[in-house]
């Protein structure tokens, strides 16, 4: 049986590791992966001083000591507010950033009111480590698909799973139900 031992230097990222103006409260949902260059990378949802969302990028050689690399993507008050649950990967020669913005407003038929999904496709600048947007779209057009995450399967498929719930309806739990919300 595996016995977990808490790392003595927890937390590995603290307020001192945030870029200037980033909220110490709205800093959450890390997604970590290892790249071909041997480094671990981590994207984290954050809220800058203007109240909109941003995605921070960190790097580590060992998974314990982390350095801030860049603000990978900024909302600039375009798509909701706080950006949660980021995921970042390469697919078909493009870079893909997934995130779940809070308090979205509709843009025609593309987005709906409330908490939605966002897929930003583009190229990552190798010098600035920022994502140059080419396409921005919803991942799902319903209201109960949030916080999607992916994994790369051994056969090369990118598999996505999401929370089949949303923040607007979470308080409406049926008391006689054994289950409430689930992953897709």
Residue ranges and their predicted role:
Residues 28-31, 84-87, 146-149:
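Beta-propeller and closely related beta-sheet repeat lectin domains
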Residues 1-29, 34-79, 92-141, 162-184:
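Beta-rich carbohydrate-recognition and catalytic domains
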Residues 153-154:
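Structural secondary-structure packing elements that flank or coincide with functional cores
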